[in-house]
């Protein structure tokens, strides 16, 4: 497998990441605000549901509020998806080496996805932390608001130290299972659809068998499975990544503290706050990601680079 193939995957993944953020960011803001609102003294307004949240943010904060944290989200998503598809492709290539059958087992797809997810998490956690904090800023924010991405980085390092950039890394690493589940489900469902279509049209290659509607269905269905199994860890990470109060005391100390407090005051429901907004965002977002990724990859394969 040529090195250019890996860069084709990375490029297609980066373009897919950008397209996904551009289309769905406002729902990401809503989801994040629901996730951290534990009902115990918050600078955020109380929202009744997803639609109410969208209209309230638009009315009180305007378009800027709905797109809070957009710049780090674009950087984070573009870099994350680019790296993810690159590492994922490299891992699959390594596991396939020396095998007579090029098709990998579900376990090897899972291992490839987990490996890629862990590497991406370590590379991008600071970007996601800044994105979360910018999304939680409102006109009523109690502390001096960050003016943007660079100011947020500088202020966090100055006030909390460099280690603060990796708050939420533990649940983030656990969330590697999210991507692993999604990609394994995607690959296995993709095999089923390809096999069904190959029986009908034996003359076409795999690339031509699937269309954008297939990629949308595969991306959406695989995302639902991953979200339902791993969503509580997204809530835990978001709560850990909140900005400390004006006296510098964080609301939560670590992941176990979040789990204890959430279970005590909110019960199981607390771990699924923002789930509706999350599904409304991520199911179509995942479809967009895979539609763009597969089509950009197909385009790049039709016009390959000369480098190996």
UniProtKB/Swiss-Prot annotation:
Bilayer-spanning residue ranges: 10-30, 74-91, 110-130, 164-184, 216-236, 274-293
Keyword Cell membrane part of the UniProt annotation: no
GO BP annotations, alphabetical order: nucleotide transport; transmembrane transport
Domain of life assignment: Eukaryota
Gene Ontology CC annotation, any one: chloroplast membrane
Chief location: plastid
Keywords: Chloroplast, Membrane, Plastid, Repeat, Transmembrane, Transmembrane helix, Transport
Bridged cysteine pairs (disulfide): none
Bilayer topology: Multi-pass membrane protein
Phenotypic consequence of gene deletion: No visible phenotype.
Tissue specificity: Ubiquitous.
InterPro entries per UniProt: Mitochondrial_sb/sol_carrier, Mt_carrier_dom_sf, SLC25A32-like
Subcellular location as annotated: Plastid, Chloroplast membrane
Keyword Transmembrane helix assigned: yes
Pfam families referenced in this protein's UniProt entry, alphabetically: Mito_carr
Solcar repeats: 4-94, 104-192, 213-299
Biological function: Mediates folate import into chloroplast.
Note, other: Appears to be a chloroplast envelope-located membrane protein lacking an N-terminal-located transit peptide.
Family the UniProt entry places it in: Belongs to the mitochondrial carrier (TC 2.A.29) family.
Protein's name in the database: Folate transporter 1, chloroplastic
Phylogenetic placement of the source organism: Eukaryota, Viridiplantae, Streptophyta, Embryophyta, Tracheophyta
Gene: FOLT1
